[in-house]
């Protein structure tokens, strides 16, 4: 059961990390558009194209924030624990993509309609990007801890199995030794009884 728990926790965290990596790419592109949109020489049509793509990326980023794994929200900041062995619990740190800084990226007011808006949007994106980097560092650390816990569990299981095997082998050897000893005693007793009967017959013959 503990091994299954660790496998599920690893899958959960790997899924988090995959979404965070995708979100990083989304924010990088949004930042690039925000820089381009600060060009005051852009035509209205050019700026509109940037804004259209920017809005689509905002929607994509928002979809990432609400992503789920096995019915559980990945990025609501909830910390989780799983039994990593009969005695220990593994901690899954909560990743929160609904902070004020992350919310600013997807806010309706975050637009590229003017150079000033684009500059403000870029600052929000850079702050959100820093938070994503921290979140990915957290998932990386969690995955390393889960791998370590899995290795310890495997070692513990193998050691326990080997111990039981040695105990079982010892029990079998003791039983075989005892049976052999009892069989030898039985044979000796039978031989003594046979010898006694033979002596008695010989004595009777002498007396007769």
What is the meaning of each model-derived region?
Residues 1-155, 165-169, 187-208:
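Amphipathic alpha-helical coiled-coil/heptad-repeat segments
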Residues 174-181, 188:
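EAAAR-patterned alpha-helical heptad-repeat segments
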């Amino acid at each position: 059961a503990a091994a299954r728990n660790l496998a599920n926790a690893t899958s959960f965290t790997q899924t988090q990390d995959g979404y965070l990596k995708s979100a990083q790419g989304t924010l990088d592109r949004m930042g690039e558009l925000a820089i381009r949109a600060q060009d005051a020489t852009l035509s209205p049509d050019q700026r509109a194209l940037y804004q259209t793509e920017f809005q689509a990326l905002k929607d994509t980023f928002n979809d990432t924030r609400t992503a789920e794994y096995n019915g559980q929200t990945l990025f609501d900041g909830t910390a989780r624990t799983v039994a990593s062995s009969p005695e220990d619990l593994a901690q899954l740190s909560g990743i929160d993509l609904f902070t004020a800084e992350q919310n600013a990226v997807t806010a309706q007011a975050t637009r590229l309609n003017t150079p000033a808006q684009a500059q403000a949007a870029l600052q929000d994106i850079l702050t959100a990007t820093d938070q994503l980097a921290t979140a990915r560092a957290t998932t990386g650390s969690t995955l390393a801890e889960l791998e370590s816990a899995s290795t310890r569990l495997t070692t513990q299981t193998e050691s326990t199995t080997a111990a039981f095997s040695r105990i079982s082998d010892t029990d079998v050897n003791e039983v075989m030794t005892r049976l052999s000893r009892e069989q030898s005693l039985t044979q000796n007793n039978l031989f003594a009884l046979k010898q006694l009967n033979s002596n008695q017959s010989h004595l009777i013959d002498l007396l007769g």
